[in-house]
């Protein structure tokens, strides 16, 4: 029990290809510094939203993370249209509020325990939502009627989300990426997941979770080159 209320963790804007980097040529008399040689601009929309045979958006593609304060593979600037987490200037959302006992547990963690909360250290699957929040690498999505497969370019992580309307299990077997059910709300695919392995962490700062964790993801593809993923963590 680490949370008092539902808190949206991130509204992450993800692009389908690396940000366009425009290189300015240097003349013989140019005195520009190295960093001034590059102008980073948002990727253009790229065309209309591709769709499956049933008319729903097709999320298939190789997606680079580009939001929530994180650039593509940590090397490129963040798209200025992306919203950083808990930026009071851009969003009225408050940072997560922990119960006193949860906050005390996090503060009592040793340096070793905090390091082990990082999936890059413990080498276990990142889990959800950490696979989005702790992953600076690409995600390849294969979308077909009835199935959404996500292949992550880190530690051989993968995830299968059935989109055939099957309900959540009443007594779910805990998995690193949980047990999911889906529904469409217009052109947005809503994925609700429960039954997570408690060895995963929401963030690599000791933010642990209980077996009551529920994660809701909302996938929207407004154009060819962009995928918006909104994640809400609910931990009573």
Go through each PLM region and give its residues.
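PEST-like low-complexity, intrinsically disordered acidic/proline/serine-rich tracts
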Residues: 2, 6-236
């Amino acid at each position: 029990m680490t949370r008092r209320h539902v808190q949206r963790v991130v509204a992450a804007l993800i692009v389908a290809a690396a940000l366009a980097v425009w290189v300015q040529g240097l003349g013989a008399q140019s005195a520009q510094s190295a960093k001034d040689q590059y102008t980073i601009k948002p990727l253009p929309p790229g065309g209309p939203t591709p769709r499956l045979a049933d008319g729903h958006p097709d999320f298939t593609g190789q997606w680079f993370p580009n939001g929530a304060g994180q650039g593509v593979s940590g090397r490129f600037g963040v798209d200025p249209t992306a919203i950083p987490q808990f930026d009071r200037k851009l969003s009225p959302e408050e940072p997560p509020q922990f119960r006193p006992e949860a906050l005390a547990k996090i503060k009592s963690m040793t340096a070793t325990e905090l390091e082990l909360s990082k999936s890059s250290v413990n080498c276990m699957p990142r889990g959800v939502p950490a696979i989005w929040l702790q992953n600076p690498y690409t995600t390849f999505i294969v979308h077909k009627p009835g199935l959404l497969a996500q292949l992550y370019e880190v530690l051989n992580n993968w995830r299968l989300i059935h989109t055939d309307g099957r309900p959540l299990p009443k007594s779910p077997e805990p998995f690193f990426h949980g047990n999911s059910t889906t529904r469409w709300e217009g052109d947005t695919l809503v994925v609700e997941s429960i039954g997570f392995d408690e060895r995963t962490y929401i963030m690599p700062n000791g933010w642990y979770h209980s077996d009551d964790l529920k994660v809701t993801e909302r996938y929207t593809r407004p154009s060819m080159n962009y995928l918006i993923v909104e994640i809400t963590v609910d931990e009573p």
